[in-house]
Amino acid sequence: MELICDNISFAYNKDVQVFQNFSHTFKPGITVLKGYSGSGKTTLLKLLAGYLKVTSGRIITPTGHRVTSRRYHQQGVAYMFQGINLLPLMSVERNLHLAAEMAMLPRKEWKPRCEALLRDLGLVELRHRRADKLSGGQAQRAALARTLMKAAPTILLDEPTSGLDDGNTDIIKKLVTQDAAKRICIISTHDSRLLELADDLIDFDHPVSC
């Protein structure tokens, strides 16, 4: 199982070249994209998620689906956006169920998967609380739970511990490590606390081209 960037290039316009002839093979485990804000980490995640299109080269997905296809978005990849991406008027539990529904996860799998994530992320007592009533750390954990509800082979996490204290960060680190052995997990971060998780590290503090 591999997610492959094959000689990809991307530019927002003729004056802003972000990637040029970049190649990398992502394998099961955790790849950390390290670097300062604006270095291209989030752009790469959006390319891998199919939200942006490469200007040249190709991305080969583990499922064989085109990176821009609806099936890939539904079942091939799960993306945790930078910032909280929860529906604010829905409960934590309903946010998780909606993620499962959108990913076409069999309904019989919803409850056990939801219960495990609520337990592992310390959200059991918050399951019926509206997302807009959560603290920052609680909302970040709920957003991760929503992402992991998808049984996708590729998980993309954009700054998952941004602004979190050590306690909340440790909870997220533990679950990501536990989940990553079976999936390709790519984390964009400038948080040094996450570097120890890396099976593979791409340093965006230096030019990303080859």
Task: Spell out what each predicted region is.
Residues 49:
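Helix-to-loop junction immediately C-terminal to a conserved catalytic motif
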Residues 65-78, 107, 179:
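ABC ATPase NBD coupling module
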Residues 90-102:
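Q-loop/switch helix immediately C-terminal to the Walker
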Residues 108-126:
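Conserved ABC ATPase "signature" region
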Residues 130-134, 138:
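Conserved ABC ATPase signature
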Residues 144:
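Hydrophobic anchor residue at the start of the ABC signature
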Residues 155-159:
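Catalytic Walker B motif of ABC-type/P-loop ATPase nucleotide-binding domains
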